[in-house]
UniProtKB/Swiss-Prot annotation:
Localisation per UniProt entry: Cytoplasm
The protein's name: Xyloglucan endotransglucosylase protein 7
UniProt xrefs under PANTHER family: XYLOGLUCAN ENDOTRANSGLUCOSYLASE/HYDROLASE PROTEIN 8-RELATED
InterPro entries registered for this protein in UniProt: Beta-glucanase/XTH, Beta_glucanase, ConA-like_dom_sf, GH16, GH16_AS, XET_C, XTH
Keyword field contains Cell wall biogenesis/degradation: yes
Organism: Diospyros kaki (Kaki persimmon)
Length: 268
């Protein structure tokens, strides 16, 4: 299934916000707003089981401290799977923090955080989740920033059996989002608005019991995302981002995990 630059009316449904989420330009643009009373959100009409899903986002300019804009994949229930992009706002002139996480069978605690090498409030930038049976890759403008591999052979759960929808939201998290909750939301600057456009899903659509990628006689080249991996050039780029822009990595936080780091942290 390919939703190329998709009409956002067709691809998404607004799920909450009482008018604070709006679709404009005949389905070409979607905005989410937050004020003191409420945030807002939307989700995809389709569920997916593997794919390469991207959207362009322009984040809140100026003083966005305390606010969080999200874009993520998630299934439902207490043992849900989830793949997260969260954008943690900051005071004027300070950088956004891009927060990533992977949940499998209801367990997360796999946070990696990054600063960006550009101002994400000045223009739209493309944020992509690649999810196939072998790996999850987070991309920013086609630059890979994180890879989470399938290490089930080592007993580490991997999201590969639960279909997920795309979700996005704009909400207040000033109890933790900015400097651990020290900087609160300045409601005199409300409403805070993030903009979304150019959604694209090259993905296997899940409909109840079957996947659109399931037929044995279909051409596997049509589902190129199922085997996508990082070549040497992109691996070099990934290492560059992680060396220069990563600001938190759960795999080195022994204070937080005194009983031992997650097992995947010790597997190269």
């Amino acid at each position: 299934m390919n939703a190329e630059g998709g009409n956002l009316h067709r691809e998404f449904e607004i799920t909450w916000g009482d008018g604070r989420a709006r679709i404009h330009n005949n389905g070409g643009l979607l905005t989410l707003s937050l004020d003191r009373a409420s945030g807002s959100g939307f989700r995809s009409k389709n569920e997916y089981l593997f794919g390469r899903i991207e959207i362009q986002i322009k984040l809140v300019a100026g003083n966005s401290a305390g606010t969080v804009a999200t874009y993520y994949l998630s299934s439902e229930g207490p043992t849900h799977d989830e793949i997260d992009f969260e954008f943690l706002g900051n005071s004027s002139g300070e950088p956004y923090t891009l927060h990533t996480n992977v949940f499998s069978q209801g367990k997360g605690n796999r946070e990696q955080q990054f600063f960006l090498w550009f101002d994400p409030t000045m223009d739209f930038h493309t944020y992509t989740i690649l999810w196939n049976p072998q790996r999850i890759i987070f991309y920013v403008d086609e630059t890979p920033i994180r890879e989470f591999k399938n290490l089930e052979r080592h007993g580490i759960p991997f999201p590969r059996s639960q279909a997920m929808r795309v979700y996005s939201s704009m909400w207040n998290a000033d109890d933790w989002a900015t400097r651990g909750g020290l900087v609160k939301t300045d409601w005199t600057k409300a409403p805070f608005t993030a903009s979304y456009r150019s959604y694209k899903a090259d993905a296997c659509v899940w409909s109840g019991e079957a996947s659109s990628c399931g037929s044995q006689d279909s051409n596997p080249s049509d589902k190129w995302w199922m085997t996508e991996e990082l070549n040497a050039t992109r691996m070099k780029r990934l290492r560059w981002v992680q060396k220069k822009y990563m600001v938190y990595n759960y795999c080195v936080d022994k204070m937080r995990f005194p009983e031992g780091l997650a097992p995947e942290c010790n597997i190269s």
